[in-house]
Amino acid sequence: MKQIPLFITVLALFAAPLSGAFIGADFGQAQAQKAKREKPKKPKTRRSEVLGKAAFQRIEQSQTWLGEEKYLEAFAPLQAILESERFSAYEKAVAIQTMGFIHAAQGDYAKTIASFERALATGHLPVRVVSDITYNLAQLYLAQGQGQKSLALLDQWFAALEGEPSAAPYALRAQIYLGMDNLAAAEKDIRLAIAKAEAPKQQWTRILLSVLLQQARYKEARPILEDAVERWPGVKTFWQQLTAVYYDADDEKLAFVAQQAMHIQGMLSSSKELSSMAQLYLYHDVPIKAAQVLQSGMDAGKIEKTEKNYELLAQSYRHAREWKASIAPLTQAAKKSDKGKFYEQLAQSHLQDEQWAKAEAALEKALEKGKLEKPADTWLLLGIARVRTEKYDAAIKAFRKAGDDDDTARDAFRWIRSIERRLAEERDAKSDG
């Protein structure tokens, strides 16, 4: 159940500015309260205009129903005040204002604005309440995307204010200026707000960073972002912005550290984010970590099982010299691809594990699929695999294919001569026997 403060009393009607929870803005009730002058002078209220007992009871009943979220019931006693001639203009103004708070609780900001403006138009509200409603209206119009109107109301609020404003109104005006692309004015106000605040606020830091980053003032943004990730380590946006700033300064190591921090905190969840993180681990010579990111991501269904991702996983295992582990992703990549390169890589993993027959089969499939960058190299490997399985005639055929290419001819014919010598020695041994 929502707890709505009784902002109407018999003694005075000094409503706090509408909370961010109501208007959908980033400036909540606590900020709005700080917007009031720190040492307010006595408001120029009309002492004769106070709520009578009947009006007070009806408004109090409306507040009770509002707290219970019984909105239709909450309107009834207020409407009764408006329709009766027994109530004063002041009491009717209070009823209209209260209707605005009910509309706000319902999320109907257009009607909230209409009620507040209608209440102001009566001319019967205390000066302090007029100030608060004006501030609320500035927030509401901003939430509705009407920056110009919001700015006009806030400037009106500043002009009527007695004393020194606190930080929040400057931050609100900075947000308005930012939405209007008036970056210079936004920066001036947000720096004033931050200077007045006891501690930096996340939303205000966001506004200042937006001003700086839009102007490519990355050097100025860097210390602010470094402070932000320490204060609010769970905010992904700050880490992303800091990473970009590090890259702009060609500080790849710190950018990598920032991205690791996001990964460790579980901020990377999409297939693209996780596969990119794996590529970074691979780039920074941590291949086994790259493989772990990809393998766990695929197993959990977070990383898409595409040809490209299987290739990256296999590459990570191969760089880590985990030949056996690379076989499964290479097999999957080979099935998905229309090129023979993955079967060739699969064969290389089998060769490292001395699985000659499996290597031979994979190389034959690689040549069958084709589209190889250097088929002569594949023929050479196939010849070697066949030698290891003592298929000498088939090996010679493969080496002759490899010999058609100048780059592999020397090695190919050296293998052929080696096979011929071995076969000759075997024949001699048999004849001697």
Q: What are these regions, as identified by a protein language model?
A:
Residues 44-50, 82-88, 120-126, 156-163, ...:
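Solenoid-like repeat scaffolds
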Residues 63, 101, 139, 175, ...:
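Residue-level recognition of tetratricopeptide repeat
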Residues 2, 20-117, 124, 129-132, ...:
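N-terminal leader/linker segments that initiate helical-solenoid repeat arrays
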Residues 51-60, 89-96, 126-136, 162-172, ...:
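Generic helix N-cap/helix-start motif at coil->alpha-helix transitions
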Residues 307-321, 327-376:
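Alpha-helical adaptor scaffolds
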